[in-house]
């Protein structure tokens, strides 16, 4: 199985008081047990570290950042300028949705790598046609 990991999943995994923390842990363990091939982007990592720092402080953000940048479980995609342009097309196409540009980069990467499934708690992935994992 190939799966894209979104900011929302990482933030929930590192924020132990989040309503979905236990659900996220179950999904994460299931992905590891299945030896899933996991992808994310530099944009997602940057956004995650920013949000974790705001919610849980510098030390947790430092641990999170180290985990993500150094993970042997993640394929860290560095989007090209061509993929950034495709992301911009996603952004324009879905003007009626409240998409972040980071989400659009994720969609462009998923589309380019033919990944249909995301580990996310963000409804926007389903709104544009991708699937999200359930526990």
Briefly describe each language-model feature range:
Residues 9-10, 47-48, 86:
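A general alpha-helix detector
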Residues 45, 82-83, 124:
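Conserved beta-strand edge residues that scaffold enzyme active sites
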Residues 42-43, 103, 122-123:
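Short secondary-structure boundary segments
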Residues 107-135:
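Acidic, PIN/NYN-like endoribonuclease modules and their adjacent C-terminal/linker elements
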Residues 75-117:
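Active-site neighborhoods of divalent-metal-dependent phosphate/nucleic-acid chemistry enzymes
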Residues 34-35, 71, 128:
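Structured helix-beta-strand junction loops
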Residues 1-40, 53-67, 134:
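Short, well-structured N-terminal submotif of metal-dependent ribonuclease cores
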């Amino acid at each position: 199985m190939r799966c894209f990991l979104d900011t929302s999943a990482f933030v929930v995994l590192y924020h132990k008081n989040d309503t979905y923390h236990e659900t996220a842990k179950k999904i994460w363990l299931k992905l590891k047990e299945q030896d899933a091939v996991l992808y994310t982007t530099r944009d997602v990592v940057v956004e995650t570290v920013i949000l974790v720092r705001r919610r849980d402080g510098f030390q947790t953000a430092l641990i999170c950042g180290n985990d993500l940048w150094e993970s042997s479980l993640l394929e860290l995609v560095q989007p090209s300028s061509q993929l950034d342009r495709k992301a911009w097309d996603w952004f324009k196409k879905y003007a009626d949705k409240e998409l972040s540009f980071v989400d659009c980069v994720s969609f462009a990467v998923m589309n380019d790598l033919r990944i249909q499934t995301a580990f996310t708690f963000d409804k926007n992935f389903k709104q544009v046609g991708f699937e999200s994992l359930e526990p």
